[in-house]
């Protein structure tokens, strides 16, 4: 939880779309090489263009608009999309005059002609940059060959962090109630100063963590849209969910609800936060975190609490539809039953007419003509007797499958050698029986080799098989334990599940 502040926190050198805003920002930039310049602002993890000056004469850059600029950290950006410097905008800086020079001294020469607080902010940025250079210089002169060198560098880092912390505390105290003080406050992490001792005599890390988490969002105004228009808020938000919140989908959902409750529905910060959480957990690569996405859909999108988040109402419908598809497939959910046909029964199914049916109506007629026989041929997923069932959907012609299936064969054989009660319910996603049977024979697939011979299951929709292969692990009760994993993870995960079951 110790923070490392040795980064250039406001840019004197990066960059993007929106427009609108009585404001007048006049910047005199000596030796300016540009013919146009941009006024940009930060918003969560992105940067947007607010205005463009298309005529620069004698270094004079002017941005004007009929509406007020929203509170935030703004940047002067060159025509080559490089940031010259950052400055803040609040209610008192809608008419702002700045001057500097386009050189290595741009930060030192930067002055606000009509805003003392802006100058205090510029001094703060210069202080941070000076401290950063001091540390880098010390690091370059320290060879770091011995433990003594490392200790010296660590001591220097602690000293600089302390200096920055003291400067920031003083700045926040002296300018309390201002927008820029609130922005700098976002960098702060509230640590328990007098940590009590645990029973072992050491500092109680649990109490320290609980205090840190409880006070993490102190003095952060979730009703102020300007809270998200700076370079710090997104990092603070990301750090909270990656390093502070217990890494579990349920805990994450609870914390999202707490944060959303702090923001007022309909405000920009509310919309941005909800859109951010929705995208983050819809696209999460961490197994099980699609549960958070489903929670967001159920709690916000289905209840009208996401109204206005997206301009296109179809996006809301798509989000709900996607979440509803994932809901029965969440880790911990009972697996949807499947009724597949053995690969060796392909010719029998073909003789009944299943492969010749041209549409769903013909397929239905064929099924009902042969109901009794087909029902006897079905291999139900729910009937598989095993401590663990590996459910895999794949295709003979799929390049990735050709790499993954041999790995799965090895994993399965190794599990059998260890006397594990495991079976593989292998579903071929096409209907080219000869090709399937040939692959099975040539590669000696030791699985339950199946396919949807009666066109009965619609596994693509039921199991979200938008690409192949897709691998699930089910327990003896056919509850989903793992999903969308690589073949080389199968044995490791089953070993983990077995170890957990023995505890």
Language-model region placement:
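Bacterial Sec-dependent N-terminal signal peptides
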Residues: 1-28, 500-503
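A non-transmembrane, solvent-exposed segment enriched in polar/low-complexity residues
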Residues: 20-176, 186-187, 191-216
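Non-catalytic, surface beta->alpha helical segment in thiol-disulfide oxidoreductase systems
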Residues: 74-77, 462, 467-503
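N-terminal, charged low-complexity regulatory/assembly segments
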Residues: 144-267, 271, 275-280, 295, ...
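N-terminal "domain-start" segment that seeds a small globular fold
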Residues: 313-381, 493, 499-502
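Short active-site neighborhood of thiol/selenol oxidoreductases, capturing the structured segment around
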Residues: 353-409, 423-425
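Structural microenvironment flanking redox-active thiols in thiol-disulfide oxidoreductases
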Residues: 402-441, 455-461
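Short, internal strand/loop/helix patches
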Residues: 437-472, 476
